[in-house]
Amino acid sequence: MLSPKTTQITIYTTSWCGPCKSAKRFLADQGFDFTEIDIEKENISREEMASMTKGLSVPQIVINSKPIGGFEDLLEYFKKG
């Protein structure tokens, strides 16, 4: 079971990404803090992001140093507990 107090979450986003907004809202609604990295503002290429997350699309979510994937993957991850 994930604990909001001990779970480290990083979400790679862009400003125009609808699923990114949904993922951030979902995490906030669940009581989780997260670090957001806007790849456009931070000038991170998708290839650089993929080397850290294993994915080219946004959002890419990393929980406790483990790449989870996108928004649908996040929902599945929480469903499994």
Give the predicted meaning of each segment.
Residues 33-45:
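Thiol-based oxidoreductase modules, predominantly thioredoxin-like and allied folds used
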Residues 1-33:
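Local sequence-structure signature of Cys/Sec-based thiol-disulfide redox active-site neighborhoods
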Residues 4-5, 46-50:
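Short secondary-structure transition/capping segments
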Residues 18, 44, 69:
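Short alpha-helical
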Residues 32, 56, 69:
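Structured loop/turn residues at beta-strand edges in well-structured enzyme cores
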Residues 51-57:
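Thiol/disulfide oxidoreductase modules built on the thioredoxin-like
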